[in-house]
Amino acid sequence: MIYLDSSVALAHLLAEDRFPPEDLWQQQLVSSRLLEYEVWNRIHARRLDRSHGDAVRALISRVALLELATPVLARALDPFPTAVRTLDALHLSSIVFLRLRQQQVRLASYDERLIAGVRALHIPLYGPAVCCKPDVSDGGIGLAHLYPARE
């Protein structure tokens, strides 16, 4: 099972000349309900809902969305081994919640801080770990140089 982070979902939706690995989309995907809000927020901010709305709905329909249940929220209040942002704490808590229920979850992300948090918790990553520095050529989402260019 692959925990899909919004950085990968947005790269798939927005980065036309770059792309996440194709085999990712053949895996069982799960994420926090936050994924839906993060993706739509970015799509609306760029005024792409008309051009990308169907693709967003199709992508989100492929992902099992985990609600922000009390145990997830409670874990997010506890400290993490690395400094994390609020949404990252909720994503990490969701992954921990699944793993405590014997789910073999790996993270697919291009978010450097989220990857650091997962590594500190000894949770495996999907595929090669890819971190990045912000890149303004893709509108500031920091994804343009993460994927191999399409040939």
Regions found by a protein language model. Name each.
Residues M1, S31-S32, E36, R99-E151:
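Acidic, PIN/NYN-like endoribonuclease modules and their adjacent C-terminal/linker elements
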Residues M1-L35, R42-A55, I123, A129-C131, ...:
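Short, well-structured N-terminal submotif of metal-dependent ribonuclease cores
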Residues L4, S31, E67, T86-A89, ...:
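Short beta-strand scaffold positions
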Residues A9, L35, V72, H91, ...:
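Alpha-helix capping/helix-boundary segments
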Residues A11, N41, A74, I115-A116:
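Alpha-helical elements of the RecA-like P-loop NTPase motor core of helicases
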Residues S61-S94:
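Acidic catalytic patch
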